[in-house]
């Protein structure tokens, strides 16, 4: 699956008629009778009949713990088996075009870099820029260290792919739960099933597959499950 012109275009289209609270974190959630209540970091509260959580499973478990929400043992065991690998990503602006051939992306199986993309070629940037993903091994080794230094190392290693272009500025981001390496067999999980909890479903790429397609299909499956509950 691919969003046009960018991956976020799909979410933006779906959210046209929705109230989306961007830049807002749910600090805690709790059961209030047959409702869910979420306490937000801006001091507001949200009350809902049903809830869907799509964050990485370790973060989801931490959020559920804030409200002392106890999950069935079988579902808890399945969730505990899910594992992720980290990724250190670099977004770099260049002073000229790269040497990356069309269509503008390279996947590498060995070495500290797993992925490079020419964002100008891909049409997601109006100026020369690249995205560099560190490999799982490199990212795990560097994750608790200085990310800017790790980013510079990736840039240095990527130099042959940049041609004569030089990096003028760059940013580094670390995803602790970048890609699931052990996933659940189900497309989603209705954790409230056979409990006194209000309807609560978990979804994401840790269920239907560790790719964007898996996350989308998991979301569809969870929506169907929640819509069928009362």
Where are these regions (language model features)?
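Short beta-strand to alpha-helix junction loop
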Residues: 1-13, 21, 144-153
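A conserved short coil-to-beta-strand element within the FAD-binding core of flavoproteins
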Residues: 22-37
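Glycine-centered tight beta-turn/hairpin loop motif at sheet-sheet or coil-to-beta transitions
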Residues: 41-43
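Central helical "cap/lid" subdomain
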Residues: 45-103, 164-165
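Active-site-proximal substrate-binding core of FAD-dependent oxidoreductases
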Residues: 80, 224-230
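Active-site substrate-recognition segment that forms the wall
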Residues: 91-142, 148-149, 153-162
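Short FAD-binding loop at a beta-strand-to-alpha-helix junction that anchors the flavin cofactor
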Residues: 130-131, 188-223
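Flavin (FAD/FMN) cofactor-binding core of flavoprotein oxidoreductases
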Residues: 152-153, 157-198
């Amino acid at each position: 699956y691919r969003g046009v012109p960018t991956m976020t275009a799909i979410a933006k289209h779906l959210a046209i008629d929705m109230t989306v609270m961007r830049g807002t974190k749910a600090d805690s959630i709790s059961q209030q009778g047959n409702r869910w209540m979420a306490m937000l970091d801006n001091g507001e509260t949200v009350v809902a009949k049903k809830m869907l959580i799509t964050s990485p499973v370790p973060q989801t478990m931490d959020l559920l713990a804030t409200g002392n929400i106890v999950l069935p043992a079988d579902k808890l065991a399945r969730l505990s088996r899910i594992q992720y690998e980290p990724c250190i990503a670099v977004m770099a602006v260049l002073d000229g075009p790269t040497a990356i051939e069309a269509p503008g992306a390279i996947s590498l199986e060995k070495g500290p870099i797993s992925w490079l993309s020419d964002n100008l070629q891909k049409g997601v940037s109006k100026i020369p820029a690249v995205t560099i993903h560190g490999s799982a091994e490199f990212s795990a080794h560097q994750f608790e260290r200085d990310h800017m230094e790790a980013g510079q190392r990736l840039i240095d290693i990527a130099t042959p792919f940049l041609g004569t272009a030089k990096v003028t500025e760059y940013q580094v981001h670390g995803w602790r739960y970048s890609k699931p390496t052990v996933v659940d067999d189900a497309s989603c999980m209705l954790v409230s099933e056979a409990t006194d909890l209000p309807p609560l479903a978990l979804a994401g790429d840790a269920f239907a597959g560790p790719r964007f397609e898996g996350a989308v299909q998991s979301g569809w499956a969870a929506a169907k499950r929640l819509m069928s509950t009362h």
